[in-house]
Amino acid sequence: MIGILLLIGICVAVTVAILYSMYNKIKNSQNPNPSPNLNSPPPEPKNTKFVNNLEKDHISSLYNLVKSSV
């Protein structure tokens, strides 16, 4: 009995999550972004700085590893 109720609860939660994501996708597609200000530069992706820093750290650590093994 408890297992059936748990299974029904999980199914309801998954269904609600799917419907909510579909609702947000439809809502966002109906309201496109307003025309951007022509004087401002295009926005960069949010994770660009973080990814660039990770990339630099990764390259420098690989360089140090190769340098120390030689």
From Swiss-Prot:
This is Virion membrane protein OPG139. Changing residue 29 to A: No effect on phosphorylation. Induction: Expressed in the late phase of the viral replicative cycle. Residues 30-50 are annotated as: Disordered. Phosphorylated by a OPG054-independent mechanism. Changing residue 69 to A: No effect on phosphorylation. Its main location: virion. Residues 22-70 are virion surface. One of its GO terms (cellular component) is membrane. Pfam families: Chordopox_A13L. The gene is OPG139. The chain crosses the membrane at residues 1-21. Keywords: Late protein, Membrane, Phosphoprotein, Transmembrane, Transmembrane helix, Virion.
